[in-house]
């Protein structure tokens, strides 16, 4: 062999090895490039640590270097032709796609009804949540929302920017504005609030000015250089995530708010990004594009399929396909239960987009993907709330028992997106199980994230462990103008569309309506020519039935023949279920099916439904033996959490029914709740059971642990008092039961010893006190005299700096009289209408719906043995 031949051979070997090594360096990953939570990435961006400068320039997959290696080995023309070939093949495949009718035109899917035709009842639980959200949306300032968009476009920036994730230093800025566009469109449809309409129209108009100023179709709150980094697989925080929110918001402004300007803006934006993606594929490869999707891209495929269903533009369909993340959807396509360690809220929107692909193209593979995904999440990764994820990621299948150790369970965004998944599946299949899931996740995972009726106060995570608190998760409650987390964006959307999944229509010869959620509301059903008024009696624990009444009025002089289908939830049972139409009893199907009524509805028709609400336990999704006893307690769709700082042990007798160890709290008990206060040093103090023994603390705000500890149920002998004030109980003997320790009693331990709390069976005469007029002589005060120690009174010790005790000081001592006199007022805390007592091993537990908790500590799962 000649030296020349040897040289050629060696060159070939080196080239071959180089290509192999290049391929190894390119070994594919399917995940997030940056395996970090959003909260961690926000902390990096706001850190002053210089190490961020290193990270920010780190190439997560330094493909340019490998491309240079390949370019040195292969002719440039061949490379260019190969990548151009990739693009040409993609184009040809898209042109061959058989596209069905637009989703709203398809007869095989249930159709959404317009939010413009649905109105929630004011004062209902859902109506209050919607109103709280409306108040927040009206607080938001147009100039502050637009600040970073104007800055990016080189326009004047009046006002000051918002903080949190909308801060000008944060790479995800602008995402909340996209959510605002969607939320305001949905809220306007739900309320027709004129002020909101004016504000959201102004935001769209000014965003259009920004887009025109940039001049390329690009529109965002950050510069397009972020996409240079994205396409180079350099570190950048999810620019397409924000673009998806803006596109989706503008599309909602077009579709829901009927703003024609918004659609033109969307199409121009998509033209810009179509060209960017095409350039990446032709310059590098289709593989390079898919590698970049390992950074979070939100629901880009979803919004692009929706856009295509409006425009019919083949480029929109192609671009949607290119955001279907094949390495993730492929796992689901082959039915691999292998989603562990994926960032949940990165990938659920990809599934939602694949569901839209099915609706647009009819490809059954994508129906199977959505169905399988819902099955594995529900069977392996879901908490009793219906939510999923821990620290923003999925754990191993059926291994969520040890995730209770974290306070960062159930990212709120994931619940928002899982509701979309289940909604699609219900519309395709009409299966009650999907409607039941929707009810559970909406009730526990959405209604739980507002802090009562405080506008703009929401949470990121919903802890599921022992002794946890919404206020004490890693981020706790957000603030109105300095949080703007991803979950604020999905939150304002969720509370703007509470009426969008109550009613669904079905095409066919006769108009058909499915009522799948029992939420007090009016619905103007135009196809059926009737107005439906649904009134739900709020659920209570002492009367375990869901009661719903439907009344009807005619939209025209005569009604049309139509069919109404009413969901029978799987959490009820047939015994005790009733249906009455105009005083005539109906035969009901078994739970998990629909009651179907076909008739010509008339004004004055009345349908009443009654479903028993069952108490039940549900095992945690963990098949390891050490977690076999860990269970949640549910009442219908409501997850019941216990007021406890960590105790969770319950022992039920063998073969005992759940009603044997869980009992409802009667309605009358709220009238028996009081707190006891004194004024001292220009402050109001109350005696509390925050720790044993009892102590005086400053008057707490409602919704806190201290508010619970300061509230006591006044028990009068074996009965209870229903006095308006305790001055009405003068001369009567009472006992005090701590609000969050049902079955326990406040007792004294003898003269000059502190008061403490024991079980009711251990109290004896030490737990009895006589209500007497206040020793300080004021008509509004009372004193509590020991039944067993005449002349000895409950004494605050404020003046002496000591705890609450039984004191027998001289009756002539003015300071003593003042310290033994209290103003008794209605309890700071009160029992939720759905409240139970569960018998525990060490203590009894007060159970209430998770949605009722604000800052209080709670336990969502219990260790139930027996």
Where do the model's predicted regions map?
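Cleavable N-terminal signal peptides of Sec/SRP-targeted secreted and luminal proteins
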Residues: 7-27
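Aromatic (Trp/Tyr) and acidic
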Residues: 26-194, 198, 228-256, 297-314, ...
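C-terminal beta-rich recognition modules with glycine/proline-rich loops and embedded aromatic residues
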Residues: 30-75, 370, 436-546, 590, ...
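Active-site-adjacent structural elements in folded domains
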Residues: 232-234, 283-290, 333-341, 400-409, ...
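Hydrophobic, small-residue-rich alpha-helical packing segments that form membrane-like cores
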Residues: 264-360
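Aromatic-lined ligand-binding clefts that engage carbohydrates, nucleic acids, or primary amines
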Residues: 563-568, 675-676, 735-737
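Accessory beta-strand-rich segments of carbohydrate-active enzymes
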Residues: 565-595, 600, 609
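A structural signal for the beta-strand cores of small, secreted beta-rich domains
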Residues: 680-698, 738-755, 788-800
